[in-house]
Every structure is written in C-alpha cells, then in structure tokens.
From Swiss-Prot:
This is Galactose-inhibitable lectin. Signal peptide: none annotated. It comes from Euphorbia marginata (Snow-on-the-mountain). N-glycosylated. An isoform with Ala-1 missing is found in 20% of the samples. The keyword Glycoprotein applies. Keywords: Glycoprotein, Lectin.
Length: 18
C-alpha cells in the first residue's frame, strides 16, 4: 500500500507492510 514497503513473503511474493 505504501511505496518501498514491500518485504519478501514465505512464498517469494511481496507483502504490504506499513
């Protein structure tokens, strides 16, 4: 939801974190 707020998930996809 926020630019640059993406982390690698357990499945290798980006997850939105504040």
């Amino acid at each position: 939801a926020y630019p640059g707020s993406h982390i690698s998930g357990p499945n290798g996809f980006x997850m939105d974190v504040k």
